[in-house]
Amino acid sequence: MAKPVNVNQSKWTVPVLLKECEIYCPSTCVAFGPILSDNDSKLIIAHGGHRGVNMKLKVFQQLEQLSESSLADMPTALVHFINDLSSIPSIAVAAGPSLLIYKNLKPFYKFTVPSSAINPTESEAWKAVVNKKINGDTLLTVLKRLEDDVAFSKLTPISQTYLRADKETQVVLVEHYGTKIANSATITCIAKLTKSTAEPLDILVIGTEHCEIFLIDSQAFTILETIKIGSVPVNICAYGTYDVDYRLFVQTRASLIFCMKRGEADYQPIVISQSMITSMVLVNKMIVYTTVENLIHFASFRGKKMNTVKCPSKIKMLEPFIYPLKQLAAVIAVFDKEIRMYNEHYLLDTVQYEKPLAWVKYGCYGREDSTLVVAFKDGSIAIQIFRRKANFDTKLDYNQVPQAHALKLQIPKKTKVFIDLTQREVQLGNRIHKVYQKNLFDVKYRLAASYLELTSSASATVSTTTVLPVEISVDIHGFGPTFRMTIHLLSSSKQNLYDMHLSIISDPELYDFDTPLIPVHLLASGQSYSFTTLLYCKDPEKAANCDVRALLVHAKRATPIVTAVIKMPFSEFPLD
């Protein structure tokens, strides 16, 4: 539970545990909202059970469980929405490729996402194995070839399972599911968007594994719009109204954030993160997202960073905190055994717990507008209420200047040498500037000449075999700290070479590679192949360089086929 703190300083009440409660689910499977005629907000949880067993839709009121319903498939997300003004709201549970609609805690409707087209070669292979025209090994070979040609994610779910299964499971898949092949898209995330201010109905927004986003009418359950993006969506945040103007902020598995507006057809990412994005929420008119580097970024709707918070440990998730009575908007960051409340400038509050946390959910529960539901890893759930008399007079700047940096510099007094140099610069300023420009041009010229000499004569190749004659050459482009390395391979062997890799090795303290291991699936005789990767100098201020080796290796050979040694040039400083 929460550690004892001073009652006058704590902004939350003492947490109270729910009775006989054991819940295991992600934060996306939790929602608040009224679902009965009493209009009291309930806690709705899609319980994932244990290994696909005992999956339930549970509803809690006060400190007890009110009801539960069984779920046929593993839930991935849940949302509470309004689809009829004359009746009570509904619940939508995303499970597999389907959207399960519950009204009055009873199954009401099932919406299934449209399936995508199946690869013709894949479909023919499954039909052939069902009709006993080919065996399971041939099917596995065909699917592996398709995996290399069209990517693993483009195959149907049954083919993906077949590729990763053992022999016994593959036989069962062919016997029971071979005739039911379908390319259904699993729902990854779900959100809701208000239709209009005059008519407070909701539009459902869902994302799928096929990189598609569907806007669904919650009354007729028809697809209003279909949006195709270049990566798999994992989180959607909606802003605005559908009939007037709306924005959809989509976090993808490739650590991109897209902004989708009404009337736009070409969607480009507004945030491109070099490290993996783990969570994203909207607070007022800001995008708040976290990365695996323990950073919280505050950005505008255009993607421009406004501030960054460096956190002391791993951030599990973010939860928006809105308190209209005090016009307070912040974000709750969940750590292992504590939660912290941040806005774009300050650290507002910290609450510590004795047990590891799983997730938190903030919203209206029962008659309380500001309730925090805290879930622990052991399955227990606690309820805390935000104090109405809580104040935020004490604020901590999370980017405080270190004490050593805050010291004033001791500027020396004006000496005779200082005065003489100042007068010289005033009198001969134009001449000094011309000499400086001449010397700078001379340095740039010598640098370019040295760089050209290095790039033309710094590559040395060593071949360790005469059976597999392969020529290798390496080009280095750029001044640093980012270089582009292009490796050229030319095979003069009579036979084609298969299943090789290019391994790039250097001092890890000096350089970092974008792709240190490049697969080389085929080297045809007499054909030239080029492979490109990026090389980053970690610390250009050291003015150090070392040799970089490019090795062409094969899994069945103990020594490299051919090796290239590159003498790297010194890195320039970054422009920014």
Curated annotation (Swiss-Prot):
Q: Subunit composition?
A: Part of BBSome complex, that contains at least bbs-1, bbs-2, bbs-4, bbs-5, osm-12, bbs-8/ttc-8 and bbs-9. Interacts with bbs-7 and bbs-9.
- Subcellular localization: Cell projection, Cilium; Cytoplasm, Cytoskeleton, Cilium basal body; Cytoplasm, Cytoskeleton, Cilium axoneme
Which effects follow disruption of this gene? Mutants have normal body morphology, but with reduced body length and width, delayed larval development and decreased roaming movements. Defective cilia structure and function.
**Main function:** Component of the BBSome complex. The BBSome complex is thought to function as a coat complex required for sorting of specific membrane proteins to the primary cilia. The BBSome complex is required for ciliogenesis but is dispensable for centriolar satellite function. Required for proper BBSome complex assembly and its ciliary localization. Required for cilia biogenesis and both the assembly and movement of intraflagellar transport proteins along the ciliary axoneme.
Task: Identify the Pfam families for this entry.
Answer: BBS1, GAE_BBS1
Checking PANTHER family in the record gives: BARDET-BIEDL SYNDROME 1 PROTEIN
Q: What is this protein called?
A: BBSome complex member BBS1
Q: Which molecular function GO terms apply here?
A: patched binding; smoothened binding
Q: In which tissues is it expressed?
A: Expressed in ciliated cells including amphid and both inner and outer labial neurons of the head and in both phasmid neurons PHA and PHB in the tail at larval stages L1 and L2.
- Note the coiled coil stretches, chain numbering: none
Its GO biological process annotations read:
cilium assembly; intraciliary retrograde transport; non-motile cilium assembly; protein localization to cilium; protein transport
* UniProt keyword list: Cell projection, Cilium, Cilium biogenesis/degradation, Cytoplasm, Cytoskeleton, Protein transport, Transport
One cellular component GO annotation, for this chain's record?
neuron projection
Q: Which organism is it from?
A: Caenorhabditis elegans
